[in-house]
Amino acid sequence: QKKEHRKQIGVFFGKGKSNSIEWNISTGLAQVYALRFKYMNTTGKPIPVLMKFIDSKGVVLKEDVLNFPETPDKWKMMSTTTGTFINAGHYKVLLSAENMDGLAFDALEVQ
């Protein structure tokens, strides 16, 4: 569900099973890229989320569990990388978990 919090619109997850969010990204140069997720976690405990970095053919290039720490009422950043050099092209970043209730995402920055 999209809603505004502190003048920023984010995607907020409620109760449910098998929650996910996906971003489509494009890169220009062959290099390792930083992936920075702008998120909020209001649950009072860290939430583990499976992150997959997928190429245009559907091949998973990186799969990792990211633990999003609690962020009482504030947007914070969580960083990881593509893990390896990737070529210019189109990719997907997929975050999924059994339960993402209390977790929200505002943006994904790729640098």
Where do the PLM segments sit?
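Extracytoplasmic
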Residues: Q1-Q111
